[in-house]
């Protein structure tokens, strides 16, 4: 890769994808980002699951509102440094972890995204196969596992979706912006039509906003509301950590905050209500409760409706996979060797890796996925805490943008050999606590709060160590 370096920038730290870029996005682009993230098969199943906790519908809505408002606050906090400097998350991490130490959080985040990218692609392809078999039942002979644990039909579905996602990604960030701008609204249109059809077939009297047979009350209900709130925050922890990769393109923080307001509390509550109407109505209409939207669509007695519904939800999956699991690892892997790995190359590394991990085998082995992803996820909370404490409390919201690309020993973010060991020292124990909460049986009741615990401990450890070791803070820098 040959490109002209800005003065003082190191080729080991800079390429055009990682450096500051023109900021053209407005609030609607951020709103569309969150629509693409929420409007997915996973989002549909998650929203429905909250109404099956045994809580009254108003209690679920309180939990949804509390959780999503916390997510909105975190998203605003995470967005600011990247919007201020116009650089992605792994570059912002250089402030806290050092210009080379930032590869630690970048690689961790990249590995999580690769695993989820493969799993999401596999789940969407499985749903697509349901629709294919609806129209071509004779192809059932090709649905038996054959190569590497996947059937011929499974390979066809997986590689088809894999290729579509890679094509959208390869066309560049501007094309991705245009894609997510219409993908979210398309899914909404299908959801509203599907909800209307379900209500028409079932009758409004048969629609219930409680999807569980059990009913909680008193302190038991209060505790479950707190758990539901924590689940909402945990569900959005991945895309929220990635959010700086998108807020960097925004013109102002006002655009970011406005987009977050419409995309998170307003959009998520509306999506959740429509979801529970559809799921509740499947019981009287089909005789069983269906939590998968594509399975619901495939039962409709109209071929055109099935095709349009399947198209909408496959589009939704492509949208969430690109914004949550494709763009971010592209930046993460490019950050490791900017002079050799472009953003596109980083994305394709993630895409190819997602095939080699055979996500269908990973997903079909709950123990393996539990150990692999939960251990990696234990890092997410502490990474939030360290980054936010560093930017807001240690650096006082000041960034030396040029120093983010300076690998000289005198560089502001060079620290000790390019690594700020204070951040590493804070990350390790906070992560170990998260792993302990996840895997030690006696601590299992705290598992739903692992993100909060990790975030608090990571930030607290870093603040104490940074103050003690007197990590130097920037003086006269770019402020926003």
Task: Identify the residue ranges that each predicted region occupies.
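C-terminal membrane-solvent junction of multi-pass transporters and transport-like membrane proteins
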Residues: 17, 21, 383-464, 468, ...
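Transmembrane alpha-helical segments of multi-pass small-molecule transport proteins
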Residues: 133-170, 185-194, 225-243, 266, ...
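Hydrophobic alpha-helical segments and their helix-loop junctions in multi-pass secondary transporters
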Residues: 121, 125-134, 186-213, 235-236, ...
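Membrane-interface "cap" regions at the ends of multi-pass membrane proteins
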Residues: 1-57, 72, 191-201, 216-229, ...
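Hydrophobic, membrane-embedded alpha-helices of multi-pass small-molecule transporters
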Residues: 27-44, 157-164, 195-202, 213-276, ...
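Selective recognition of specific alpha-helical transmembrane segments in multi-pass small-molecule
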Residues: 42, 66-74, 108-120, 185-200, ...
């Amino acid at each position: 890769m040959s490109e002209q370096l800005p003065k003082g920038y190191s080729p080991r730290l800079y390429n055009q994808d990682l450096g500051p870029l023109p900021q053209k996005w407005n609030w609607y682009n951020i709103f569309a980002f969150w629509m693409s993230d929420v409007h997915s098969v996973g989002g549909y199943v998650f929203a429905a699951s909250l109404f099956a906790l045994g809580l009254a519908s108003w209690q679920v809505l309180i939990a949804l509102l509390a959780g999503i408002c916390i997510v909105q606050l975190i998203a605003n906090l995470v967005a600011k440094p990247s919007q201020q400097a116009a650089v992605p998350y792994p570059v912002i991490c250089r402030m806290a972890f050092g210009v080379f130490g930032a590869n630690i959080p970048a690689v961790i985040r990249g590995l999580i995204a690769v695993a989820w990218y493969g799993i999401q692609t596999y789940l969407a392809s499985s749903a697509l196969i349901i629709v294919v078999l609806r129209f071509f039942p004779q192809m059932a002979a090709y649905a038996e596992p054959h190569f590497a644990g996947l059937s011929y039909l499974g390979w066809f579905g997986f590689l088809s979706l894999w290729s579509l996602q890679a094509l959208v990604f390869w066309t560049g960030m501007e094309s991705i912006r245009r894609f997510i701008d219409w993908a979210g609204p398309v899914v909404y249109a299908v959801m509203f039509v599907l909800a209307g059809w379900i209500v028409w077939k079932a009758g409004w009297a048969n629609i219930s906003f409680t999807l569980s047979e059990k009913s909680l009350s008193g302190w038991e209900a209060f505790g479950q509301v707190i758990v539901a709130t924590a689940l909402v925050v945990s569900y959005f922890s991945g895309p929220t950590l990635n959010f700086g990769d998108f807020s960097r393109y925004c013109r102002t923080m006002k655009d970011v905050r406005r987009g977050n307001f419409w995309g998170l509390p307003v959009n998520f509550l509306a999506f959740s209500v429509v979801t529970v109407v559809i799921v509740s109505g499947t019981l009287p209409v089909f005789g069983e409760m269906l939590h998968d939207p594509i399975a619901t669509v495939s039962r409709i007695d109209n071929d055109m409706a099935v095709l349009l519904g399947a198209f909408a939800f496959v589009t939704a999956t492509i949208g969430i996979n690109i914004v949550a699991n494709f763009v971010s690892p592209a930046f993460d892997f490019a950050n490791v060797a900017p002079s050799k790995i472009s953003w596109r190359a980083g994305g394709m590394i993630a895409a190819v890796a997602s095939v080699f991990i055979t996500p269908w085998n990973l997903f079909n082995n709950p123990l393996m996925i539990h150990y692999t992803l939960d251990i990696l996820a234990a890092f997410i909370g502490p990474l939030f805490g360290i980054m936010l404490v560093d930017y807001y409390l240690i650096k006082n919201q000041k960034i030396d943008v040029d120093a983010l690309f300076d690998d000289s020993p005198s560089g502001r973010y060079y620290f000790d050999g390019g690594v700020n060991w204070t951040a590493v020292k804070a990350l390790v124990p906070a992560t170990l606590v998260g792993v302990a909460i996840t895997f030690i049986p006696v601590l299992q009741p705290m598992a739903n709060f692992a993100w909060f615990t990790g975030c608090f401990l990571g930030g607290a450890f870093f603040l104490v160590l940074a103050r003690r070791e007197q990590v130097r803070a920037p003086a006269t820098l770019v402020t926003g």
